[in-house]
Swiss-Prot record:
It comes from the Eukaryota. Phosphorylated by CIITA. Phosphorylation at Ser-256 by TAF1 in early G1 phase disrupts binding to TAF1. Ubiquitinated by TRIM26; leading to proteasomal degradation. InterPro entries: TAF7, TAFII55_prot_cons_reg. GO terms for cellular component: cytoplasm; male germ cell nucleus; MLL1 complex; nucleus; transcription factor TFIID complex; transcription factor TFTC complex. Component of the TFIID basal transcription factor complex, composed of TATA-box-binding protein TBP, and a number of TBP-associated factors (TAFs), including TAF1, TAF2, TAF3, TAF4, TAF5, TAF6, TAF7, TAF8, TAF9, TAF10, TAF11, TAF12 and TAF13. Part of a TFIID-containing RNA polymerase II pre-initiation complex that is composed of TBP and at least GTF2A1, GTF2A2, GTF2E1, GTF2E2, GTF2F1, GTF2H2, GTF2H3, GTF2H4, GTF2H5, GTF2B, TCEA1, ERCC2, ERCC3, TAF1, TAF2, TAF3, TAF4, TAF5, TAF6, TAF7, TAF8, TAF9, TAF10, TAF11, TAF12 and TAF13. Interacts with TAF1; the interaction is direct. This is Transcription initiation factor TFIID subunit 7.
């Protein structure tokens, strides 16, 4: 069976549940089941202008009625052969009729206020009066309080603000990739310098003491050699011996001074390379942390364009990490070569 495009779409019926006192409900049920022709004379419904109150007449007996909102939607089905069911409506309201109610309740006049928040709160309080806390069966008594939690408030952000924030983050990431920065704490630097001076002082004093003792030993050997040579060679000229002694002493002192200067230069070079290694380790750790945060961000983002952009930033961070690792390894090799000397 082909469907004609000109056919009007099927519309659901507008329905609600009518709840009556037991004696009146039995009268209406019998009239419906018997197929009474004049059902309109048996049952009539009249709603007031507010749309929430009305009058239900059963056998010309007026009952006060109130239209309430059910906790959830109930589907209404109908069947012809009791085998196939067709959905006819979604029922979300119920008209409750009572004998003791006021047929014409007083109309509440809303006080006009300039504050929109106050008006909104009053409307919300007014709607609460017509909220039905129970279901349509006995087991669902107080179902709204027992099973339904309060709706969580969500803070919605306008789409232009979101786009601006995304663009700002992307531009910040692009700038951060091409920027090299270093954090230096002045207090920590001073403490490190003081510790370095305190540590190097004993070493330098020990080196000088060792250097002085070495000079004394060398002088002692020279004097011993001279004394032995003077005993063996009594004919050597005294002036020549003194000149040779001064020359040898000067040579020894010059060699010791050169060695001391060379050691000081090596120590300064080692300290400089060690400082560069520490700085490079800090930069490498910072780059690795940024790469890790970028990977976490890529896992959370679902937009394909943003994911590609973040992936490009991550690739640049990986390349930067490789370069820093190479620089760190070269500095460590240079330091090892100096220490071996």
């Amino acid at each position: 069976m082909s469907k004609n495009k000109d056919d009007a779409p099927h519309e659901l019926e507008s329905q609600f549940i009518l709840r009556l006192p037991p004696e009146y409900a039995a009268t209406v049920r019998r009239a419906v089941q018997s197929g009474h022709v004049n059902l309109k004379d048996k049952l009539s419904i009249e709603l007031h202008p507010d749309g929430r109150h009305g009058i239900v007449r059963v056998d010309r007996v007026p009952l006060a009625a109130k239209l309430v909102d059910l906790p959830c939607v109930t589907e209404s089905l109908k069947t012809i052969d009791k085998k196939t069911f067709y959905k006819t409506a979604d029922i979300s309201q119920m008209l409750v009729a009572t004998v003791d109610g006021d047929l014409y309740p007083p109309v509440e006049e809303a006080a006009a206020t300039a504050d929109p928040k106050a008006n909104k709160k009053k409307d919300k309080d007014k709607e609460k009066k017509f909220v039905w806390n129970h279901g349509i069966t006995l087991p669902l008594k107080n179902v709204r309080k027992r099973r339904f939690r309060k709706t969580a408030k969500k803070k919605y952000i306008e789409s232009p603000d979101v786009e601006k924030e995304v663009k700002r983050l992307l531009s910040t990431d692009a700038e951060a990739v091409s920027t090299r920065w270093e954090i230096i704490a002045e207090d920590e630097t001073k403490e490190t310098e003081n510790q370095g001076l305190d540590i190097s002082s004993p070493g330098m004093s020990g080196h000088r003491q060792g250097h002085d003792s070495l000079e004394h030993d060398e002088l002692r050997e020279i004097f011993n050699d001279l004394s032995s040579s003077s005993e063996d060679e009594e004919d050597v000229n005294i002036l020549d011996t003194e000149e040779d002694l001064e020359r040898q002493l000067q040579d020894k002192l010059n060699e010791s001074d050169e060695q001391h200067q060379e050691n000081e230069g090596t120590n300064q070079l080692v300290m400089g390379i060690q400082k560069q290694i520490d700085n490079m380790k800090g930069k490498l750790q910072e780059t690795q942390d940024r790469a890790k945060r970028q990977e976490d961000l890529i896992m959370k983002v679902e937009n394909l364009a943003l994911k590609n952009r973040f992936q490009a930033v991550l690739d640049e961070l990986k390349q930067k990490e490789d370069r820093e690792k190479e620089q760190l390894s070269s500095l460590q090799e240079e330091l090892e070569s100096l220490l071996e000397k």
